[in-house]
């Protein structure tokens, strides 16, 4: 039974799923805004918010944690140097998910836009 299990599987094994979510999070940090399905947006929201919270600590350990989690130095430094100071006075809720009226043509999935507030 699947009681108290968090997160979606997205029809992937654990390793490819982690890589998929990490790449989507990297794209969001790099661009500031990503249009994707509603389920994917909901899946990366807590992950990215936690990364911004880690970056707000402004310590060497926080910087190394970001580097290990994101595995992209430019993106990790953007979180550490740009996003964390921008949200220093904010406790949480760094991201906004806006549901779109459009759906994908090929499979009818509902699209959403996830962006930084």
Q: Locations of the language-model features?
A:
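Ribosome large-subunit tunnel/peptidyl-transferase-proximal elements
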Residues: 1-88, 102-117
